[in-house]
Amino acid sequence: MNESADNARFALLNHSRVVVLLLLGLVVGVAATGYRTYRQYSMPSDTFDWNNRGHSDFHNGVYFPTLAFREGVNPYSNAMVDRYLIPRSSPIYSPVVFIWHAPLSVPALNEADILFFLLNTAMLGLLAWMGIRMSNQRHHRGLWILLFAILVYSRPGHVTLFTGYFTAELVIGSIVALHFGSTRPFLSGLGMLLASGKPTYVLPLIVLLLCRQNYRAVAIGLALCVAGGLIGLGWLASFSNPMEVVAGINEGRMALHGDAAEDPVNTWTRLDTVGVVSKIMGWKPNDFVYLGSMLVLLVVPGWLMFKASLNERNRGATGLTATIACLTILVSIYHHAYDSLLMVVPWIGITFFGSIDRAEMPEWARRTLAVLLAVPLANYLSTRAFLQKAGLDPQGYVWESITSANGVCLLLALVIVLWSAWKLSTKINPAVTEDQVASGS
C-alpha cells in the first residue's frame, strides 16, 4: 500500500488532542496492569498460588533460575528447588536465557520486578514500532501509540506484563530473524540467538528459515546458538561435572511433565494443534509425540515457503512466507496464549498496511486473515478468571470450544496463507527487483 495514502488515512491519529487521549489510554492500561500485578503479587514460595500470579513467571522462570545459574547451582535440577523458594525447577530453556538475564539477578527481587515490568512494557512498544517499520512505513506517531495501547490491553500483552514471562524477547528475536533473513544474515542470526531461549521457538524457526532459503542466516544463527549454549553449560559444569549437568536437565524435564497444569486436558491457554486435539481427546502426549508432530506439521508449510519464496515480493517480517513461518511455529509445537504475540507484527502489516500484495492474496483472504489473527489477541473468554466465574464444566463442550478457539483460528489462518503460497508458487516469477529485496518489500 502507498505510504502517502497511509499517511492520509492515519492523519487524524497525529492530531495533538488525539495523541494526548491515546497516551492517556496507554498510561491507564500500563498502570492498571501494574496495579493488578502488585495486588496479586506472587510471593516466593515452594507452592504455586493460582490466586496470586503477579510476576510468578518472572520469579519462577527468570529471576531465581538465573540467580541459581549465576551462583553455580543447576537451574534445571531439584537442587534449585531445595535452595530457593520456587515450586519447580526451570523448564528446558537454553542456558543463553540465564546469560542474558544475569544482570536482572543482581538487584533484590522487588527491584528486579520493577525493572522487568518496565522492560516488558518497552518491548511491547518496540513490537508496535516494528510492525509499522517492517511494513515500510514511517511517521505514524499516533498509530504507534494506538498499537502500543492495543498490545498492552491485548490478552497476550496483558498476561506477559502481569505474570512476567519473557515472551516478548523470544518474539522480537524470531521477527528479527525472519525480517532480515534474506538481507542481513548476521542480524538475522542474532535474532535466532535471542529466540533460542526456548526450543519451541528456535527449532521450527531454523527449519523454516532453511525452507525460506536463508542459508547464511541459519549458519550464523546456529553458530551463535551453539556457542552460547556451550558457554552456559560450561559454566554450570565448572561447578560440578558434565554428567551432573545432564542429570539436572533431565530432572527439569520430568518436573515439567509432572505438573498437572501443563496437561492439555487441564489448560485453557494452549494454541498448538496437538494441544487442542489432546484437550478434546483427553490425551496427554509425550515428548516424542510433540517432536514427531512438529516435524510432520512443518512439511507442507516448509515446502510451500520454499516454492513461494522464489516469487514473493515482500520478503520481510510482514510478508507471506514470514506470516506462514510465525503461524507454523505456533501451531506445530507446544505454545500458550502469551505466545500469540508472535503474530503481532504480521497482523499489523496485514491489517493496517496490506503488507501482503494483492497478487499474492485476494482482498477477502487478507480481511479474513486479519480477523482470525485478531482472535487470540482479543480473546479474554479463554482465561481462568472467566471460566471459573462462568462455572463451566472443564469436560464440557462449551469449555472445550472456548479454550480451543485461539488454536483453531490460528490453524484456519495457516490454511489461508498456505493456499495463497500454493497459488503464488504456480505463477511465473513476477520479476522481484533488487530494491524490493533490499527493503524487505
Question: Where would I find each of the regions flagged by the language model?
Answer:
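Hydrophobic alpha-helical transmembrane segments of integral membrane proteins
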Residues: 99, 152, 195, 200-201, ...
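Hydrophobic transmembrane alpha-helices
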Residues: 108, 195, 346-347
